Amino acid sequence: MGHNGSWISPNASEPHNASGAEAAGVNRSALGEFGEAQLYRQFTTTVQVVIFIGSLLGNFMVLWSTCRTTVFKSVTNRFIKNLACSGICASLVCVPFDIILSTSPHCCWWIYTMLFCKVVKFLHKVFCSVTILSFPAIALDRYYSVLYPLERKISDAKSRELVMYIWAHAVVASVPVFAVTNVADIYATSTCTEVWSNSLGHLVYVLVYNITTVIVPVVVVFLFLILIRRALSASQKKKVIIAALRTPQNTISIPYASQREAELHATLLSMVMVFILCSVPYATLVVYQTVLNVPDTSVFLLLTAVWLPKVSLLANPVLFLTVNKSVRKCLIGTLVQLHHRYSRRNVVSTGSGMAEASLEPSIRSGSQLLEMFHIGQQQIFKPTEDEEESEAKYIGSADFQAKEIFSTCLEGEQGPQFAPSAPPLSTVDSVSQVAPAAPVEPETFPDKYSLQFGFGPFELPPQWLSETRNSKKRLLPPLGNTPEELIQTKVPKVGRVERKMSRNNKVSIFPKVDS
C-alpha cells in the first residue's frame, strides 16, 4: 500500500506539474516576445533618428542646390523646391513625435490630449499629401519638356497655380481628421484614441483619401513615364526620316531627351518606387484595422508601419543629389571651395605666428593675394636650362670684355699701341644688344634689390630685375642695370650705303665696309 500510494501520488501530481510547466513556458514565451519587441522598438527609434537628421540635411542641400545653380528650368526648380519643403516640414512635424511614441508608448501624456492629437494628425496628413502630389507635377513637367522642348507648356504663373492647388488639395483632404479622431496616416500610425471606432464614415474617408491622394497620383506618374518612354522610342524613326529627306517639317514635333532629362526621369522613377515599397506595411495595417476590423495587430507590424514609410523622406534628397550629374558636380565643387577657403584661413593664421620668427618674403607680404601673385610670377619667369646656360655665357662674355677694356686702359697708360678696329655693328644688332655694364665690387655698391621682399605696390616686378633681363619671357625690352646706362649707351653709326645697277636693271644695296 505504501508502495502503491507512493506510486499513485506521483501520478496524481502530474497534472499539476504539467499545468505549472505550461504556465512557465507561456511566461517564457511572453518574456521572449516582450524582449524582442523592446529590442525592435530600440531599433526603430535609432532608425528614425537617423532618418530625421539625414532628411533635414538632404532636403536643405536640395533647396540650396536649386537656389544656387540654374541647372534646371524655373518650373522644374519650383516643383523640386516644393518637394524638398514638404520633406522638411514632414521631418520636423512627424518624425519627432513618432520617435517619442516608439521609445515609450506611455510617456508624454500631453501627446494623447484630443486637441493636440488632432492638430498633429492634420499636419501629418497635409505634408504627406503634398509629398505625394508633387510627384505627378514633376512628371507632367518632364512630359512637356521632352515632347515640346522648344515650347513652354507650363509657364511660371501656371506652375505657381499648380503648387497652390497641391497645397489646397492636401489641406482639403486632411480636414476630416478633426472629425474622425482615430485616423492613421502614412508617416504616423499612432491613433488619437485607443479603441477603434468601426464607423462607416471612417471607412469612407480612408477609401476616398487613399484613392484621390495616394493611388491616383502614383498611377498618373507611371502613365506619364510610360508616355515619355513611348514617345522617345517612336522619335527615332522620325529622326531617321527627316534626316533622309533633309526637309524639316514644322508640324512634326520630335521629342528630345538629353542626359539631364534621363537623369531626372531615373530620379523620379526611383523616388516613386521607393515610396511604394516603403508604404506596403502601412497599406497592410490600414487593411487590417479598417477593412478586416482586426483590433489586435502585431507590435512588429505597427512599428514597421511607423518607421519604414519615413525612409522615403531620406531617399528623395539622396536620389536627387546622387543621380543627377550636374547637381553632384555643383555640390562637390562647393565642398572643394569650402575646403580651400578653410585651408587658406589656417595658412594665414599660422603664417602670422611664423612672421615673428622668420622674415620670409611670402609671410611678410601682408596679403594672401599678393603672396599668391608673387609665387605665380616666380613660376612663370623661372628660367629654363637653356636660358640659364645662355645667361651664364652672357655673364662670362661680359667679364671677358671688361677684362679686355681694363687691359687696354693699362696699355694706354704705358704707351700707344695700335689695335685692330672691330667691325661696325648694324642697326638691328645695336638695338638687340646693350652695352655691358662695368663690373662693380659688391663691397662698395651692394645689390639694390637685396632689400626687396616681394612684389608689392612700391616694388619692381621680378621680370624687370637685372637677373632676368635676358629671359625670353620678359615683358619689356632688355635694359641695363640702371636707366643712366641706357641713356649713356651710344648706337654706332652705320656706314654709307652704295647702290649699284645690274644688267637686269635690279638695284643692289651693298653696305660700305671699311677696309
From Swiss-Prot:
**Membrane topology (Extracellular):** 1-42, 104-118, 182-207, 289-299
Parts of the chain on the Cytoplasmic side: 64-82, 140-160, 229-267, 321-515
Name any GO cellular component annotation. Answer: plasma membrane
Specify the glycosylation sites in chain numbering.
Answer: 4, 11, 17, 27
Compartment(s): Cell membrane
Q: Where is the composition biased (Polar residues)?
A: 1-16
Entry superkingdom:
Eukaryota
- Write out the GO MF terms: G protein-coupled receptor activity
Q: Which InterPro entries match?
A: GPCR_176_Rhodpsn_7TM, GPCR_Rhodpsn, GPCR_Rhodpsn_7TM
Main localization of the protein described in the UniProt heading: membrane
The GO annotation for biological process reads: adenylate cyclase-inhibiting G protein-coupled receptor signaling pathway; chemical synaptic transmission; circadian behavior; G protein-coupled receptor signaling pathway
Keywords, comma-separated and alphabetical: Biological rhythms, Cell membrane, G-protein coupled receptor, Glycoprotein, Membrane, Receptor, Transducer, Transmembrane, Transmembrane helix
Chain residue ranges for the region called Disordered: 1-20
Q: Does the keyword Transit peptide apply?
A: no
Membrane-spanning ranges? 43-63, 83-103, 119-139, 161-181, 208-228, 268-288, 300-320
Q: How does it sit in the membrane?
A: Multi-pass membrane protein
Q: Which SUPFAM superfamilies is this protein grouped with?
A: Family A G protein-coupled receptor-like
**Annotated family:** Belongs to the G-protein coupled receptor 1 family.
Question: So what does this one do?
Answer: Orphan receptor involved in normal circadian rhythm behavior. Acts through the G-protein subclass G(z)-alpha and has an agonist-independent basal activity to repress cAMP production.
- The protein's name is G-protein coupled receptor 176
Originating species? Homo sapiens (Human)
